[in-house]
Amino acid sequence: MKYYLIVGEASGDLHASHLMTALKAEDPQADFRFFGGDLMAAVGGTMVKHYKELAYMGFIPVLLHLRTIFANMKRCKEDIVAWNPDVVILVDYPGFNLNIAKFVHFETQIPVFYYISPKIWAWKEYRIKNIKRDVDELFSILPFEVEFYTLKHRYPIHYVGNPTVDEVTAYQKAHPKNPEAFLADNNLEDKPIIALLAGSRKQEIKDNLPDMLKAASAFPDYQLVLAGAPGIAPEYYKQYVGQAKVKIIFDQTYRLLQHAEAALVTSGTATLETALFRVPQVVCYYTPIGKVVSFLRRHILKVKFISLVNLIADREVVKELVADTMSVGNMQNELKKLIEDQEYKNRMLAEYEYMAARLGPAGAPQHAARKMLELLKK
C-alpha cells in the first residue's frame, strides 16, 4: 500500500519513523511519501519537505512566515492528489494537519488517519467538529483521551498504547545502568545527581532554568546535571547558569535519568519519561504572565493538571509548581521532601506504577500499524 505521512516537528519524526517501521513489518510492499524528517527518511520512502521548513512556533513567527506556510500547505495538497495514496496519516501538528484533513475529506476519496491526536481536551475543544467530519480514524497514545472522545463527543477512537513506553523500555534493555561509566564519561563527581530538564525551547529555558538552579543549589551533597536540549548551543545555557555549579550534558537525557536521584522538570513528554525511569520529580513551569495563566487554568483551560504523569493517572502523582506558584522556595521545599522524606518518595514511586499500568505495555507502533492495516483492508 501507499502511505502519505505528515509531521511538523522532531517528536513527530521520531514517532512516525517507528510507525513506518511497524507498517513495513506488517506490509512488506509499503511505499512511503512524507513531509517529515531524517528519522523517517532513514526508514525509507520519499521526503517531499523536511519538517524544519514547516515548524514555526508562536504568534509572531507564524505571522511573519504566513506566505511560506500557505505555500507548504498548497504543495502538500497538490502532492497528495498527484500521488494518490491509499491513506493519509497525520501525526500530531494540528494547525497544519487539520487543514490538510479538511482538504483530503472534501476533495478526494482518500481515507484520513490521525496518529497522536490533537490535544483538544486541553485547548481548542471546538476542533472536535472538524475532526469528526474530516478524520476517518483516530489513534490515541493517551488513555484518558478515550473517555474524552468516545463518551463526551460520541467519536470512537483507538487507544494503541504510548510510544514513550517503547522508547524507554528499548533504551533500558540496550543500555544497562552503569553509574561508574556515566560519571567517568561526563567528568562528574561521585555524588548523587539532581537532574534538571529545563525545556526544549529557548524561552522555556530562559524562564525556568535560573530559578531551578537556585533551588537545586541548596543541596550541596548532590551534584546538578542539566540535560541540554537538541538544537540549543551550550553558549545559550551559560548566560543563565551564572555562578551555579552545574554540568551540562547533551544527547544523554535518558542516560541522565537512569542515574538521577531526583529531578526538576518542565512540563511535556519529559515528565512522563522521568516517571518511566522511576525518578522522583517536581514539575516546574514559570511564565512571566503567571497570574494570567493561573486564571486561565481555573476558568478557561479544560484540565486540572499540566503534567502528563498527573493527567494519565487522573490524580496528583507529582507536585506541579506552575505560573505564580513556581518559586525558588517552593521548589526547594518539594525537592527536600523528595530527598529526605522516604515515605513521600515511596508514595510517588508507587503512583508511578499505577500510572504505568494505565498506559499499558510497550508496542504502540505495532498496535497502531496492525489496526491501520485491518481498517484499510475492510
Where are these regions (language model features)?
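Nucleotide-activated sugar donor-binding and catalytic core shared by glycosyltransferases
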Residues: 1-378
